[in-house]
Amino acid sequence: MTDRDVEWFKRCHAAGLIKGRMLEVGAARIKGDPNLCDYARQLGVTETTGADLDRYDGVDVVADFGLSPEAFNAQWQLDRFSTVCVFNVLEHTFDPVTVLTNCVSCVEGGGRLLVVTPSVWPLHSYPGDFNRLLPDWYVTFAKRNNLELLEKHFCWLSEFGIETISPTPEPTLPSFLSRRNASPLRYWVSRTGHKLLNTYGRSHWATCSAIGAAFLRR
């Protein structure tokens, strides 16, 4: 989990998207780092549950979200949650549609589903690295599952900051040009410096970027 992921999570909390009981899918603490349940409790969320494939540190419930929906519902013993968070999990699943569909089934009516996945990222096989999901995938998933994709919280998370993904005319990857509006002084000082020193310049596109998507279950 990156600092940008945590920043987006805190923005969602400030916007009132994280209420009531919260479930984190993929909650194992890696190398002792905090998981989302930890951050949520720091923000005042009192009821948090962590789920993962095995009994690791930070995991309260062992569950396989990769099962067919029928098999998953048969094994799932908990009530639905007001908020379900799935951060940096789907890229490690061979069938992200099934996994996220099972996550949706854990969200109560009127609840929120918060998802973060890398879109441009180095390979990281833990245990496998299978896919990179892009904006159109999220838009289509919402339509097929009767979810509302909350446009204000549908964002690129990158070295250039957090910026809303515009669905029209067509989504584009985050670029340093976006900082021209967000940080104009820094943008022009940096660009002038590269020109004066005749450097190779900076990367036009984010070398690492992720997508944060918030859904409302109708």
What is each of the regions a protein language model found here?
Residues 1-19:
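Class I SAM-dependent methyltransferase Rossmann-like catalytic core
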Residues 3-6, 84-93, 164-172:
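N-terminal short leaders/motifs
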Residues 5-11, 34-35, 197-199:
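Short alpha-helical segments and helix-capping/turn motifs at coil-helix boundaries
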Residues 12-13, 40, 142:
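Hydrophobic, Leu/Ile/Phe/Ala-enriched alpha-helical segments that form helix-helix packing faces
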Residues 20-124, 136, 213-215:
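Conserved SAM-binding loop
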Residues 94-218:
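S-adenosyl-L-methionine-dependent methyltransferase catalytic module, highlighting the catalytic core
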